[in-house]
Amino acid sequence: MDKKHIIIDLEKCIGCFNCMLACTDEFVGNRWAPYSEKQILTGEKWIDTRRYERGKAPYTEVTFVTQTCRHCAKAACEKTFPQAIDRREDGVVLLDMKAAKGNKALVDACPYGMIKWNEELMTAQKCTMCAHLLDDGWEEPRCVQACPLRALSIVRCTDEEFTEMIDNLKLKPLEEGDNRPQVMYRNLYRLNSCFIKGAVVRKENDIIRAQEGVDVQLSLNDELIDYTKTDFFGEFKFDRLPKDSGVFKVTVKKDGFASVSKEVTVGEESQFMGELYIE
């Protein structure tokens, strides 16, 4: 049977929070038995978009990471409270409404913090992937439907097909572990890797001019690992570098000019090299 999976693309998300608003619109004040009790207006987010930064001034990049219930195939909450979990054949994981009532310990059973506590109704709650809508013929849950740039998408496929999709699209879970989440991420490098950024310029008659189309090479331990050309603004960037990956050498080459090299160390943070002058 086909299972339902959510894919979240970090390169596409701009932090508009439409997914959060759509979830609130669907569940606040609305009881969808036997799927879920109504959500309270404040203090509870079944889907949450958080802001992260890479780099430091004067060059930083912002990445928005949307998190929700992972609908894990091997869910930690299910291991702790098997009687409170309703695992559907399509892979959607629901909380049993009766078993969740008064069971605040369910909140701590999720290692990702995605089970919430409704203080008004004294019940544990979480994302249902809008199962009540999908069962009624909807193609997408509200969060996916509301995403203007398709940073969120739903996929219906077999486990084997999804495994192939993971390899082809280089999908990864947000956290390492053996819980086998049904929610996977694309372009996770925007969160957990570093970049090297800089610019190539030339001083002409006391005017500093950006140099477009200049070759820039990146080496590690005297081995060439990447290369690029500067853009219209004379800027270059090397990305997807592992944290604490060592001392890199950036070399700038342009016909008719002496090559310029500079070392830069990549630790926990991305690095901005500033301007490299060619003469």
Can you say where each PLM-predicted feature lies in the sequence?
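Short, acidic Ser/Thr/Gly-rich low-complexity loop/linker segments typical of extracellular
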Residues: 221-237
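Flanking helices and flexible, charged tails adjoining ferredoxin-like Fe-S electron-transfer domains
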Residues: 31-68, 79, 97-103, 107-207
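A structural signal for beta-strand boundary/capping segments at domain termini and interdomain linkers
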Residues: 78, 210, 259-261
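Hydrophobic beta-strand segments
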Residues: 212-219, 250
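Exposed aromatic-hydrophobic patches
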Residues: 95-97, 235-241, 274-275
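Extracellular beta-sheet/turn segments enriched in Thr/Pro/Gly and aliphatic residues
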Residues: 180-186, 262-279
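A short, solvent-exposed loop/turn motif at the edges and junctions
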Residues: 247-263
